[in-house]
Amino acid sequence: MNKLHSFAHWKSALTLVLLVAGLPASAQTAQPSGSREGVPTLSGYMEVHLNKEQDLPAEADLHRFVLMVGHSFTDRIKFWSEVEVEHAFVEGAEESGEVAIEQAYVDLMLHRRFNLRAGMVLIPVGIVNERHEPPTFHGVERTFVDSVIVPTTWRDIGFGAIGDLGRGFSYRAYVVPGLDATGFTADEGIKDGRQQGGHADASDPAVTGRLEFRRGGLTTGGSFWYGGSGFGLTRLDIEPPTVGVSSLDARYRRGRHELRGQWSMVNIGSAGDLNRALQLQSGNSPNIASRLLGAYGEVATRVSPDSWQHEVVAFGRYELFDTQNKMPEGFLPLEEFQRSALVVGATYFPDPDVAFKFDVVRERNKSSVVNAPWRVNLGVGWWF
């Protein structure tokens, strides 16, 4: 990709972000938030899991330990960061642990409706990718939809705008580097195509955004990601595939009851050409789909008496997550990746910021050969 073409991509992406954000009609002062000026803020969360999968030994894991640091240089210039350690320690490979910067950005507060953000940002798609502290969701593990369809945790270097539009509406919109299509797979879709902000190739940018509405106990949101994924294919004679991600979600809480749902879809352009090109490169076709689709619905109810100071919440969730939903011409779906799951369990809150969790997961797929496993999970998580 030549420099002129790359510049044109970035110019178009920045223009779209500004159009999504909109400019304020007046020049009111943005309201300060975060730590007091000159005083750093420390926060964090942790989650420990005990997982037992069918026919496998039980596994105990300090899955995540995260520290967050914020600082207000002035009432208009604010910094926020998040450093994560996965699986307790690092020993040369991600399977043995990982240290990662999940967020590290600066906000320039200009106006309630329009403020600038730059740095390492979380892609604002779905519910869990931006808000995944353990007490904020039921179940020991994150949802399948937010792991397989929306590749949580999804982060990258970004520049864009955030704001509160009033009447319950807010938004976030960024320009970010694109994906690496050579990492796409049949079972986890675009997950291994994330660049994660480390020496990210920015020649084929993407735009991403979210519009959110809050009113009382209801929160709804619509989000998207759209951009290129072809920089890793420069040696192959194919048109760089574009990727579009769209997602709708809703959360509602009233009294003892909670409802939550999400629908997410990924479209991969030129998936057939991509499969053929990668097969020539590696000798095996990755069988990448042209469309991935996922959705879930969750119901939760507080079952502890009102006289208790602590809360016990029972929940049930049904998920569909199909990474072979639509195949390019000439390719057949792998039925073991057309999946569903039923998750039932309970969460005990001795404090609103501490959660002890239990669930049972029954996963299914359409294959008559590959059996999906069942799992029993225990976990504890907190944040402060």
Kindly label every feature range from the protein language model.
Residues 135-143, 189-192, 276-280:
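Short glycine/proline- and charge-enriched loop/turn segments
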Residues 52-54, 93, 104-109, 137, ...:
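Outer-membrane beta-barrel pore domains
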Residues 30-181, 203-220, 291-304, 313-326:
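Outer membrane beta-barrel
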Residues 7, 88, 365-367:
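Short strand->helix junction
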Residues 188-233:
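Loop-centered beta-sheet repeat module
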Residues 1-7, 14-56, 384:
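N-terminal periplasmic/intermembrane-space "pro-region" immediately following the signal or transit peptide
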Residues 145-148, 195-198, 237:
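Short, P/G- and charge-enriched loop/turn segments at secondary-structure junctions
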